[in-house]
Amino acid sequence: LDTGCQSEAGIVMDLDSGAVLFAQNIHVQEYPASITKLLTALVVVENTSMDEQVTFSHDAVYNVESGSGNKLQLEEGDVLSVKDCLYVMLLQSSNQAANALAEHVGGSREAFADMMNEKAASLGCRESHFVNPSGLNDPEQLTSAYDMAQIGAAVFGNPTLLEICSTTSATLPPTINNPNGRTYSMEHKLVVTGDSSDENYYPSAVAGKTGYTSLAGQTLVTYAEQDGRRQVAVTLKSTQRTHYSDTKTILDFGFARFKNVSVAENETDYVTGEEPVTIGDETYSPSDLYLDEKAVVTLPNDAQFSDADKY
């Protein structure tokens, strides 16, 4: 089905069932750019505490791609908490904060990249390889829309990271170049736009992360909620700046065309009484079997639960 998505790759995944609702080149390797920082954040929160203090080294601040920016003027010798570094990295896409966090948690950026790859593999990512925590250009830094959806699902399923990624503005504590602190805003336009007349207005958008490099083009990961349903959308290699409009289009497609149906409320084949139950080659006692009350299956709107293939 042609939705008009102009990005090279795009995906919409239902976060409650894991079903892929829209797919366009989802297993093609592309450059991720700064959406890499979602995985960086996930590794950080799983391996350190939020109140630990991070000291910015010379390498963290200055060993970045020329022209990649330093919007908050972070400097060698600055000290921020892990929490503040995460906010700066995820809202302002600070490469310096990504580097500092990687050095703090992994000991070096190279060791941290190994941790990133291990975490990605544990999430089922098979088409990704990470060599730095920021997403700056590197021919070996690759991912796919499918893998980034898996990473996004893990990030937005983490309450700490969901809170950060849905925050529209935050305050930087005093630093060397900002002695009075500084307020800054999130860059993801679908999340921050409150004007219904704006082309980037999308009230279902809750959280997300932007990305751009010369190799990657525009990349975008977006988490959205609507009528009790949760979706993550990824667009990669948008070269015509259609990443926001593409994301709105494919999220709308997922919300409009599909529904979630409770498995526990509809499954009857495995309702047990007192007798043992055989499934395949295995026999179970009734007490061994139960249906997860939260489990859902995502179906097209015109389909019934009985239409679903149980195998």
Which residues fall in each region the model found?
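Domain-terminus/edge residues, biased toward the C-terminal soluble/receptor-binding domains
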Residues: 125-126, 140-142, 146-147, 152-311
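Active-site-adjacent loops and short helices of periplasmic peptidoglycan-processing enzymes
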Residues: 1-146, 150-159, 164
